[in-house]
Amino acid sequence: MSLSNSLGLLGRKVGMMRLFTDDGDAVPVTVVDVSNNRVTQVKTQENDGYVSLQVTFGSRKASRVTKPEAGHLAKAGVEAGEIIREFRVTPEVAGKYAAGAAVPVADVFAVGQKVDVQGTSIGKGFAGTIKRHNFGSQRASHGNSRSHNVPGSIGMAQDPGRVFPGKKMTGHLGDVTVTTQNLDVVRIDEARQLLLIKGAVPGSKGGFVTVRPAVKAQASKGAN
């Protein structure tokens, strides 16, 4: 669920490109497909104890949907999607939608708005401390043999005689949920339901992302 009482959209990362301003400046943008967002359930304070909108995105074969989920979607009259997420909203926002209703991009976002984009970062596999934790290499010579890229000492003395939990070491890198905050919406293509967001967003091409109004939106430069 979102961290604020704001409706967001689910989408798929299409890729990156650049736009040019009237002054000729190049602006790198990520294209996010947010088409066919639809409401699967409207939760209310009376029935559920809180107010939210449950939204799905994409399409999925009927054979890949569990029976409980199929019944839930059939009740809403909605085609099965690839992902389902829930957004906490105000009662006023929830009152604008009913189960089965589409959520167009223009209802949620506007050009110039700050957004937070959440996705799954690209998996890098097993990585060393230099790549994983930005460690520096050891000396290339002067007596250093076969220890150029190792982390070095990881332990303590006889007391406590153990490696503390959380020690930065080698291990799996990437493939975790990441949120990039305060990105600008540069352009909205309402016909194709595309969001063009300034900068990079987490994940690989084709990965699912969740776009929300920024929780900690930064004030513009020059503001008091």
UniProtKB/Swiss-Prot annotation:
UniProt modified residues of type N5-methylglutamine: Q158
A Pfam entry, by short name: Ribosomal_L3
Keywords noted in UniProt: Methylation, Ribonucleoprotein, Ribosomal protein, RNA-binding, rRNA-binding
GO molecular function: rRNA binding; structural constituent of ribosome
Biological process per Gene Ontology, one example term: translation
Processing after translation: Methylated by PrmB.
Xref: InterPro entries: Ribosomal_uL3, Ribosomal_uL3_bac/org-type, Ribosomal_uL3_CS, Transl_B-barrel_sf
Cellular component GO terms held in the UniProt record: cytosolic large ribosomal subunit
Function description: One of the primary rRNA binding proteins, it binds directly near the 3'-end of the 23S rRNA, where it nucleates assembly of the 50S subunit.
Family membership noted in the UniProt record: Belongs to the universal ribosomal protein uL3 family.
Xref: PANTHER family: 50S RIBOSOMAL PROTEIN L3, LARGE RIBOSOMAL SUBUNIT PROTEIN UL3C
Subunit structure: Part of the 50S ribosomal subunit. Forms a cluster with proteins L14 and L19.
Name under which the protein is recorded: Large ribosomal subunit protein uL3
Originating organism: Acidovorax ebreus (strain TPSY)
The encoding gene: rplC
